[in-house]
Amino acid sequence: MRANLIEIFESIQGEGFYIGVRQLFVRFAGCNLNCYYCDTPKTSENCLDLTANRTLKNPVSAEYVQGRIDSSKVHSVCFTGGEPMLQAEFIASLSKTHPFYLESNMTLPEKAKKLKFCDYVAGDLKVREAGLKNYDEVFQKTVKCFKVLRNTRRRKTFCKIVLPDKFDADEVLNSAYEIKNYVFGFVLQPVFGSRVEKILKLQKRMIDFADTRVIPQVHKYLGVR
């Protein structure tokens, strides 16, 4: 089994409820969405293993990734992207010698069914202002994904909402309410450099039905990957 990867590296988690835990990051190439604020390349001829200081030709073998997982001293293995669900079969082929932490845009419900074994799910709820085509269809797929990968005693699932300067607070509130029973909490994440006043007002409304926190991309402030 092989997969197209952008990079492999060890660092701390810089987003969401688990900020600061040490993780092995496996960043997949390719995404089914095109959010205007995305800062990750979609394709790469090579995969950079930044911790091992190696350059690998894509696609990278599951055996290589498994070796990196087994040798790492980390809290968990973070599968990120891109969109890791596009290569769900690759993730499913790996052995969980460390807990698996999935970061996903939550728009591929059929793929989500193959990843129920993940221990942590950091799932996105995209806002209309992200500039996606067929937004209403995307949102319905997101609801289905959260239902498949809902929070349980064995799987910790939360929702991250990336917010630009301008967004429809009522629509975000109503969308979050639809998935509140599938997550243990929400993270409102400002697009890097955005103002937060409107986000703080939204948080005040959302805490009526869920643990809701405003958390920026901390790794960018620290200057780490």
Curated annotation (Swiss-Prot):
PROSITE patterns assigned to the protein according to its UniProt record, in alphabetical order: RADICAL_SAM
Binding of Mg(2+), residues: 40
Binding site for substrate: 12-14, 27, 80
Catalytic activity: 6-carboxy-5,6,7,8-tetrahydropterin + H(+) = 7-carboxy-7-deazaguanine + NH4(+)
Superkingdom assignment: Archaea
Residues bound to S-adenosyl-L-methionine: 82
Cofactor info, note text: Binds 1 [4Fe-4S] cluster. The cluster is coordinated with 3 cysteines and an exchangeable S-adenosyl-L-methionine.
EC number: 4.3.99.3
Domain Radical SAM core: 18-225
Residues reported in the UniProt entry to bind [4Fe-4S] cluster: 31, 35, 38
Keywords for the protein's UniProt record, in alphabetical order: 4Fe-4S, Iron, Iron-sulfur, Lyase, Magnesium, Metal-binding, S-adenosyl-L-methionine
Named cofactor requirement(s): [4Fe-4S] cluster; S-adenosyl-L-methionine; Mg(2+)
Pathway(s) it belongs to: Purine metabolism; 7-cyano-7-deazaguanine biosynthesis
GO MF annotation: an example: magnesium ion binding
Function statement: Catalyzes the complex heterocyclic radical-mediated conversion of 6-carboxy-5,6,7,8-tetrahydropterin (CPH4) to 7-carboxy-7-deazaguanine (CDG), a step common to the biosynthetic pathways of all 7-deazapurine-containing compounds.
Family in the record: Belongs to the radical SAM superfamily. 7-carboxy-7-deazaguanine synthase family.
Self-association state and partner proteins as the record states: Homodimer.
Protein name, entry field: 7-carboxy-7-deazaguanine synthase
Organism, scientific name: Archaeoglobus fulgidus (strain ATCC 49558 / DSM 4304 / JCM 9628 / NBRC 100126 / VC-16)
